[in-house]
Amino acid sequence: MARQQAPPWVHIALILFLLSLGGAIEIPMDPSIQNELTQPPTITKQSVKDHIVDPRDNILIECEAKGNPAPSFHWTRNSRFFNIAKDPRVSMRRRSGTLVIDFRSGGRPEEYEGEYQCFARNKFGTALSNRIRLQVSKSPLWPKENLDPVVVQEGAPLTLQCNPPPGLPSPVIFWMSSSMEPITQDKRVSQGHNGDLYFSNVMLQDMQTDYSCNARFHFTHTIQQKNPFTLKVLTTRGVAERTPSFMYPQGTSSSQMVLRGMDLLLECIASGVPTPDIAWYKKGGDLPSNKAKFENFNKALRITNVSEEDSGEYFCLASNKMGSIRHTISVRVKAAPYWLDEPKNLILAPGEDGRLVCRANGNPKPTVQWMVNGEPLQSAPPNPNREVAGDTIIFRDTQISSRAVYQCNTSNEHGYLLANAFVSVLDVPPRMLSARNQLIRVILYNRTRLDCPFFGSPIPTLRWFKNGQGSNLDGGNYHVYENGSLEIKMIRKEDQGIYTCVATNILGKAENQVRLEVKDPTRIYRMPEDQVAKRGTTVQLECRVKHDPSLKLTVSWLKDDEPLYIGNRMKKEDDSLTIFGVAERDQGSYTCMASTELDQDLAKAYLTVLADQATPTNRLAALPKGRPDRPRDLELTDLAERSVRLTWIPGDDNNSPITDYVVQFEEDQFQPGVWHDHSRFPGSVNSAVLHLSPYVNYQFRVIAVNEVGSSHPSLPSERYRTSGAPPESNPSDVKGEGTRKNNMEITWTPMNATSAFGPNLRYIVKWRRRETRETWNNVTVWGSRYVVGQTPVYVPYEIRVQAENDFGKGPEPDTIIGYSGEDLPSAPRRFRVRQPNLETINLEWDHPEHPNGILIGYILRYVPFNGTKLGKQMVENFSPNQTKFSVQRADPVSRYRFSLSARTQVGSGEAATEESPAPPNEATPTAAPPTLPPTTVGTTGLVSSTDATALAATSEATTVPIIPTVVPTTVATTIATTTTTTAATTTTTTTESPPTTTAGTKIHETAPDEQSIWNVTVLPNSKWANITWKHNFRPGTDFVVEYIDSNHTKKTVPVKAQAQPIQLTDLFPGMTYTLRVYSRDNEGISSTVITFMTSTAYTNNQADIATQGWFIGLMCAIALLVLILLIVCFIKRSRGGKYPVREKKDVPLGPEDPKEEDGSFDYSDEDNKPLQGSQTSLDGTIKQQESDDSLVDYGEGGEGQFNEDGSFIGQYTVKKDKEETEGNESSEATSPVNAIYSLA
């Protein structure tokens, strides 16, 4: 019956259990501990598995072991007990298991060949050695043979076989001549891995020597030579060239197996004329460049330390100019067992749990066999505290009786591995392993470690105390390692004292004491300076030192980094070095080295000796000046929580004294790689105390400055991280502003690295409505903004933003007032229209009841009307404080409709509408026409009445508070027409067809009470725009026009007083711009921001059609034709002739009259400028616009433009406006075409 496989969760549970088992105890190497503790045996030395010996020497088979008590040894041979006492040649060394087989009294070593295994035993278990295979080295003689000369054709391949006698180990093969000269080898003649000598092609010169194969045997150190070969080469007139063919291996493919970890050697030897070249490749990949190398003139490929990924197909390519051939070698990589997890000795306390793991891999996969004390585990006595789970043995609740030695044997067909691991159960009270009452002396602000090695079973718990106090030292400035060492990160004066370490387990406790003394650092506070001296003078180099008085100070001098010999001309004192009678050989660098037994400090200076007495003694005046060299050898000392001392060695000042040192720092958390200035120090110092911020990983560098300039920065110092602390400040620039009507965005400037003070800097954002008793809302944010949603429209909020890190919160933050988002305001209240006389209309209003934000002004739109006729719509823009306005009536018989709305940043709100009273001379009052939709700004600046209505219904349009400059475009038609006025930013649309359309509109305006800018007007073209505005500033005031294109490029144009209108040039066709005008003296007084768009650029080849030569010629030809027709007409009438009349009133032109359907030949030219959006056709003519209607369209109801009697009107007119008649009266137009039909 097949065994049922366990579910996956069982394996997972087993793995988790194994991971939960406690770690084993490690026995220290202390000899006293090793001698006192009982321990099962452990094999410490043994012979190799394949042990080959020299038959001329005694045989030695090693086996050594340790244990307490000392183990005894015995051997097996070929799996049977080997009785050493019965063989007089075999002995065992004392206190060792090493076997010695002595052949001095005779005997054959071959009789002792076999498989040996050593057993080491004491009362706690038995350990086993590997199975050692003993073999005796052999070097057999070469069989005697007579070799005939080898006859070969010139150019043919040849193989000389060696066939050495089998030896143990295999001999080393090499070829020589009978005169003991080595055979020269190259890519044509070479020796194969099997020892044979291969000739890719034989040449006549190969007969000049003979060839002898030699075998060298390693153990016997002997060389045996085979009888030599002699060659006889048959010559021909010409050696035929041949394509390559393989001499070794044969055929096109072969296979090879190699073991993991061994070297793979692939070989290809080819024949051919000329000699082929060999190249190597791997199918599906590249050769491993790090462990592949070519040998034997590229005929062999060696891959060292083979692994599984080296398996695959390799092929060698042999080629010459006649062709190429390929041989494929399939490589399979197998593996003898190798360790993944070798079992280790396990030392436990009574009652503890543990495990032994024996995990190995191989190809094929090896099997695992457990043994205990040299016997299979299956035949060993049962142990309820032991459980075997494949490659793991689990021990639970171990006792003293559980001690034993376990063997793990893992094997496959290619080899085996054997490992011993003992299980020892100890109950040992804590013991201290170091000397008692040690004295440790350290330098102030340095880092130090106090050691307290201990041992015990179970593993003791270690605690540290200072000066007998009860608090345990761990955390903050202290850190306790698992081995018992106490690290003090930065020594201070108050850390001096007696430290006690206490180790405790269930069997007792042990303690030891360490006395710590803190010493002041050694510092050179007055360093020697660079000097220039004349030959023969006296020089003194100062070196004053401050050190701890309890330490012995030694001051020594170096010259050019070598110890200085103090001769008769020198005097060395405690704080100086004096040189009398300076000579040229005294020039060089002098180093003062002040040292104690704990630390040292160095200072260096350079002495320059001037040989010429006339040379100035001032080196700086005699040599050119330059920037100083960079400082070097930066050192951090006096490490404190909020400060550190930085010391550096100045560089050469290059003949200009150093005036300043700039210390910079870099931190690697917020802005890695960015250097910031920290502080500045005078050039006379080379050491400074730097005040630091908490929790910054500092790195410093120093820059020297003289009158010439700054040096290159020094190399960075080592990093120093300060300890953390709660923030001492909060973020700045806290604001609360709405981005939508129902939210408020809280923003602030984030804190930098030097103000974070700790890890995980974050911000606690609080808010609540102002002047309410609501509880604070709060949220933690890691960025620099937070959006509060679902807020009422434009209400004040109290806002607080507080910094926090892992060490705590910052100070209580200030309360900032912010506002939620604005919305469209309600309509102005009490909008009143009064008419004191016929010339003036007064308007008054009150502020909106719900402004829903900050009012930025009012927009008034009004339009005169008389009956069903509408005038031009006017637009006025007012400041937010203005509540009155007067309109001067241009037409005393018209009424006015007014629409007033307030504005916030969001836009214009609901409008209040009123009408002026009816004038007294209005005979028949008529109902006012429907209210026109507000004028809105589109992207093109042109909005029809239909478009404006749709736009007002679907979106909140931005109304531009300016008076437009208009360019009219009139569509001529006899039906109810629409006049569309094209403006830069506004459009007025009416349903009435006035007789004419004016090119501008005059607006009656009233200036605001305070200083302001209003009525900004923009008239754009494709590449320029004219700007005008109104203001009430004093005369001579300067302004600035600021405009921004759609690419966010901002430009400004200063405007001198009374310089209007202003033209903006270099604009881009078809681009949208925003514009405002503000006072140059007070930027806070600005106009409303408006938007306009330039028109599309015209093509370069566009020209006025009326100036084209072909058009003038055509007109002249038509005029001449008309004149001729008129003459013919008058002649025929004078003769009484008749001409047919074609009725045109109700019948359109037929197909036999195609030219009448081409439209009229009328030409409209308004100021020689094409309409916006028109383009020139390819042939230079103007494309027919939508106003160029057919002849039928010029009549009402499809009537033609002839009199009813069909008479011809001999006139030719050019239209200037497309609407020349009103009502339904038909117009009569004449053309040459009419004249042609009148003659028919």
UniProtKB/Swiss-Prot annotation:
It is a single-pass type I membrane protein. Residues 907-916 have a biased composition (Low complexity). Residues 41-137, 143-230, 244-332, 337-424, 430-517, 521-603 form the Ig-like C2-type domain. The modification Phosphoserine is found at S485, S1160, S1174, S1187, S1190, S1226, S1227, S1231. InterPro entries: FN3_dom (IPR003961), FN3_sf (IPR036116), Ig-like_dom (IPR007110), Ig-like_dom_sf (IPR036179), Ig-like_fold (IPR013783), Ig_I-set (IPR013098), Ig_sub (IPR003599), Ig_sub2 (IPR003598). Cell adhesion, ankyrin-binding protein which may be involved in neurite extension, axonal guidance, synaptogenesis, myelination and neuron-glial cell interactions. This is Neurofascin. The lineage of its organism: Eukaryota, Metazoa, Chordata, Craniata, Vertebrata. The gene is Nfasc.
